[in-house]
Amino acid sequence: MAPRWSPDSWRSKLIEQVPVYPDLKKLAEVEQQLATFPPLVFAGEARELKAKLARVAAGEAFLLQGGDCAETFAEHRADAIRDFFRVLLQMAVVLTYAGGSQVVKLGRIAGQFAKPRSAPTEVQNGEELPSYRGDIINGIEFTEEARVPDPQRMLMAYRQSAATLNLLRAFAQGGYANLDHVHRWNLGFVKDSPAGHRYQELAGHIAESLRFMRACGLTPERTPELRTTSLYTSHEALMLGYEQAMTRVDSTSGDWYATSGHFLWVGDRTRSLDQAHIEFLRGIKNPVGAKCGPSLGPDELLRLIDALSPANEPGRLTLICRFGADKVAKLLPPLIRAIKREGKSVVWTCDPMHGNTIKAAGGYKTRPFDLIMREVEAYFDIHRSEGSHAGGVHVEMTGQNVTECVGGSKAVTETNLSDRYHTHCDPRLNADQSLELAFIVSERLKREREGRPEPEISIAAGE
């Protein structure tokens, strides 16, 4: 029987990736203040997401998870949020049509402020200072003052998350998600992309379907489902003091839910079974995820599942696999076989970003688009050969025209990286690269769909 859990039981465990605050009294005061603030999301929304993820686990839907490597205070602008939302919608429409099933949209947004680091300090020009750990903890400026962890930043992160969520809800329900608009945006991408001829056929089929639905009376003006959408939020549960303060009892069920986001995940560096991050995540009722890197073997994975999803509840646990294009073929199959052998219910999703990071000649971290796509293709191949469901993709992306990942049809090169390299942490796919990934994945989903029986569809004609 699992030990008794409470929102603060993690405090008795060893913890990794925690900042050292110089004034613990001020930290406690901020955490107490956060505990009085309204929730950012609601338990019913988290349950709704879990039900949709259960469909993904059953092979009946696909998960699209994407967003910033790390949100920042400086880049908190309405146009940046709008552009992210637009690109994620464009990706989802293409994947929905090609796969013939629901796409669950999950943003790395409205809470993705903290980042684990490989070293506690960094050196620039011979000077050593604490590492930048995300705007919720300290500043990116390389000064002694900026790098001191400041608990007031948690209050700033809460307020920014609330404002971001408010705008996202308005976009999702206020008509910006109109399917006709999204299709026009995709046509613009196809027209302007050097590889547009490859995607023209799919775009044409979507246009035909929209014309057919309009002829049947299914228009955005008359059908709310064609002008609104659902978008859920997610982030890594790294700052456990913040997460504890935002964890509340649901009045309808009596269960504990994290209200900082709909979906939280544990990172590859903090998933030790006897440590604080797993202890916290095991007790909340939200759907949760776990990053699975090269160091995770089948036996440890099964123990991780037993800790985070002891009831084997469909939709509860998503495994976010991040191996690298050169390792996925060796490391992923044993994990899939162990899950199938033990009858575990999980969502399998592919993070093709973190295992494919390299350093360019100019010193910039980057991710080659061809390596990203090689890992995605291998992920689909492996799941197909193992008889399991390739449930989704998890990408670091932006709606902006940055130059951080090399490659893609518009051929960002290493010499281009300095043009618009804006990330505070890891390189992200830009808008065009994100859409190109979606179109390539859609081709794979179409092949997968053509290999299974078509469901019966009934459409009532309009007036």
Briefly describe each language-model feature range.
Residues 18-22, 54-66, 123-141:
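Short, compositionally biased low-complexity segments
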Residues 70-71, 76-324, 367, 375, ...:
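Active-site-facing alpha/beta catalytic cores
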Residues 1-62:
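N-terminal basic/disordered segments at the start of proteins
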Residues 1, 53, 402-403, 463:
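N-terminal leader/presequence segments that precede the conserved core
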Residues 48-50, 274-277, 304, 333-335:
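Glycine-rich, charged/polar anion/phosphate-binding loops
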Residues 301-304, 310, 316-348, 354-403, ...:
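Non-transmembrane, aqueous-exposed alpha-helical and coiled segments at domain scale
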Residues 53-56, 94-96, 280-281, 382-386:
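A general structural signal for short secondary-structure junctions and capping/turn motifs
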Residues 64-69, 106-109, 350-353, 396-398:
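Short loop/turn segments at strand-loop or loop-helix junctions that form parts
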